[in-house]
Protein backbone atom coordinates (compact mmCIF):
# COMPACT_ATOMS: atom_id res chain seq x y z
CA UNK A 1 0.00 0.00 0.00
CA UNK A 2 1.36 3.38 -1.03
CA UNK A 3 0.18 6.47 0.84
CA UNK A 4 1.06 9.95 -0.40
CA UNK A 5 1.70 12.56 2.28
CA UNK A 6 2.96 16.10 2.15
CA UNK A 7 1.69 18.80 -0.16
CA UNK A 8 -1.87 17.51 -0.34
CA UNK A 9 -4.16 20.53 -0.11
CA UNK A 10 -7.25 20.00 -2.23
CA UNK A 11 -9.23 17.48 -4.25
CA UNK A 12 -7.03 18.04 -7.30
CA UNK A 13 -3.96 17.04 -5.26
CA UNK A 14 -5.74 13.87 -4.12
CA UNK A 15 -6.71 12.97 -7.68
CA UNK A 16 -3.15 13.62 -8.86
CA UNK A 17 -1.68 11.40 -6.12
CA UNK A 18 -4.08 8.56 -6.94
CA UNK A 19 -3.34 8.91 -10.66
CA UNK A 20 0.35 8.50 -9.79
CA UNK A 21 -0.42 5.22 -8.00
CA UNK A 22 -1.18 6.23 -4.42
CA UNK A 23 -3.74 4.10 -2.59
CA UNK A 24 -4.55 6.99 -0.28
CA UNK A 25 -3.33 10.32 1.04
CA UNK A 26 -2.51 11.83 4.41
CA UNK A 27 -3.46 15.44 5.08
CA UNK A 28 -2.40 17.33 8.19
CA UNK A 29 -2.20 21.14 7.96
CA UNK A 30 -5.70 21.60 6.59
CA UNK A 31 -7.12 19.91 9.70
CA UNK A 32 -5.27 22.27 12.06
CA UNK A 33 -7.45 25.09 10.76
CA UNK A 34 -10.69 23.39 11.81
CA UNK A 35 -12.98 24.16 14.72
CA UNK A 36 -12.52 20.61 15.99
CA UNK A 37 -8.72 20.85 16.26
CA UNK A 38 -7.66 21.31 19.88
CA UNK A 39 -4.82 23.72 19.08
CA UNK A 40 -5.24 27.17 20.61
CA UNK A 41 -7.04 29.90 18.64
CA UNK A 42 -3.70 31.75 18.35
CA UNK A 43 -2.05 28.67 16.81
CA UNK A 44 -4.85 28.33 14.27
CA UNK A 45 -4.69 32.05 13.52
CA UNK A 46 -0.96 31.72 12.80
CA UNK A 47 -1.91 29.28 10.03
CA UNK A 48 -4.53 31.69 8.67
CA UNK A 49 -2.07 34.61 8.72
CA UNK A 50 0.79 32.62 7.17
CA UNK A 51 2.15 33.43 3.76
CA UNK A 52 4.23 31.04 1.70
CA UNK A 53 7.37 33.08 2.44
CA UNK A 54 6.81 32.59 6.19
CA UNK A 55 7.65 28.88 5.93
CA UNK A 56 11.21 27.92 6.82
CA UNK A 57 12.96 24.55 6.97
CA UNK A 58 14.45 24.12 10.43
CA UNK A 59 16.42 21.38 12.15
CA UNK A 60 15.10 19.62 15.24
CA UNK A 61 17.50 19.29 18.18
CA UNK A 62 18.52 15.87 16.86
CA UNK A 63 18.97 17.06 13.28
CA UNK A 64 15.66 16.11 11.64
CA UNK A 65 14.30 18.73 9.21
CA UNK A 66 10.81 20.16 9.39
CA UNK A 67 8.81 23.09 8.04
CA UNK A 68 7.91 25.76 10.56
CA UNK A 69 6.38 29.21 10.48
CA UNK A 70 8.95 31.94 10.87
CA UNK A 71 8.24 33.77 14.13
CA UNK A 72 10.19 35.36 16.99
CA UNK A 73 11.29 31.90 18.20
CA UNK A 74 12.74 30.95 14.80
CA UNK A 75 14.41 34.35 14.43
CA UNK A 76 16.06 33.91 17.83
CA UNK A 77 17.30 30.46 16.75
CA UNK A 78 18.90 32.06 13.68
CA UNK A 79 21.11 34.10 15.99
CA UNK A 80 21.70 32.01 19.08
CA UNK A 81 20.99 28.91 21.11
CA UNK A 82 17.90 29.07 23.35
CA UNK A 83 18.98 27.89 26.82
CA UNK A 84 17.13 24.87 28.21
CA UNK A 85 15.87 25.30 31.77
CA UNK A 86 14.20 21.89 32.10
CA UNK A 87 14.83 18.60 30.31
CA UNK A 88 11.76 16.50 29.55
CA UNK A 89 13.87 13.47 28.53
CA UNK A 90 11.75 13.13 25.41
CA UNK A 91 14.53 12.31 22.96
CA UNK A 92 17.18 9.75 23.78
CA UNK A 93 19.82 11.42 21.62
CA UNK A 94 19.16 14.91 22.93
CA UNK A 95 21.87 16.51 25.06
CA UNK A 96 20.39 19.60 26.77
CA UNK A 97 23.84 21.15 27.14
CA UNK A 98 24.49 21.04 23.41
CA UNK A 99 21.21 21.20 21.46
CA UNK A 100 20.06 24.60 20.16
CA UNK A 101 16.64 24.47 21.85
CA UNK A 102 14.14 22.21 23.63
CA UNK A 103 11.62 20.96 21.10
CA UNK A 104 9.15 19.88 23.79
CA UNK A 105 9.07 23.32 25.42
CA UNK A 106 8.74 25.00 22.02
CA UNK A 107 5.82 22.77 21.01
CA UNK A 108 4.07 23.20 24.37
CA UNK A 109 4.39 26.99 24.08
CA UNK A 110 2.87 26.97 20.60
CA UNK A 111 -0.03 24.64 21.39
CA UNK A 112 -0.91 26.70 24.48
CA UNK A 113 -1.09 29.81 22.31
CA UNK A 114 2.33 31.40 22.85
CA UNK A 115 2.97 31.48 19.12
CA UNK A 116 5.85 33.96 19.41
CA UNK A 117 7.89 31.69 21.68
CA UNK A 118 6.77 28.41 20.21
CA UNK A 119 7.52 26.14 17.31
CA UNK A 120 4.71 26.05 14.76
CA UNK A 121 5.26 23.14 12.42
CA UNK A 122 3.29 23.37 9.20
CA UNK A 123 2.93 21.98 5.72
CA UNK A 124 4.25 23.47 2.51
CA UNK A 125 0.80 24.81 1.57
CA UNK A 126 -0.01 26.58 4.84
CA UNK A 127 -0.05 29.90 2.99
CA UNK A 128 -3.11 28.71 1.06
CA UNK A 129 -5.21 28.25 4.22
CA UNK A 130 -7.41 31.30 4.70
CA UNK A 131 -10.20 30.33 7.09
CA UNK A 132 -11.18 28.20 10.05
CA UNK A 133 -13.66 25.59 8.85
CA UNK A 134 -15.20 22.40 10.20
CA UNK A 135 -13.97 18.88 9.58
CA UNK A 136 -17.32 18.12 7.95
CA UNK A 137 -16.96 21.02 5.50
CA UNK A 138 -13.34 20.17 4.76
CA UNK A 139 -14.14 16.51 4.08
CA UNK A 140 -16.98 17.58 1.79
CA UNK A 141 -14.63 19.94 -0.08
CA UNK A 142 -12.02 17.19 -0.48
CA UNK A 143 -14.47 14.54 -1.64
CA UNK A 144 -17.04 16.26 -3.85
Segments the model singles out, each with a brief description of its role:
Residues 1-2:
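Conserved small/polar residues in nucleotide/adenosyl-binding loops
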Residues 5:
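Short hydrophobic "strand-cap" motifs at the C-terminus of beta-strands
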Residues 9-144:
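Conserved active-site-proximal phosphate/metal-binding subdomains
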Amino acid sequence: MYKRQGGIFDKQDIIHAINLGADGVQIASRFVATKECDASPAYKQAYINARQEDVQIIQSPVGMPGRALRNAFIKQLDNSRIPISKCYNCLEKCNPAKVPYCITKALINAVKGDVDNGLIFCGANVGRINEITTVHSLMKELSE
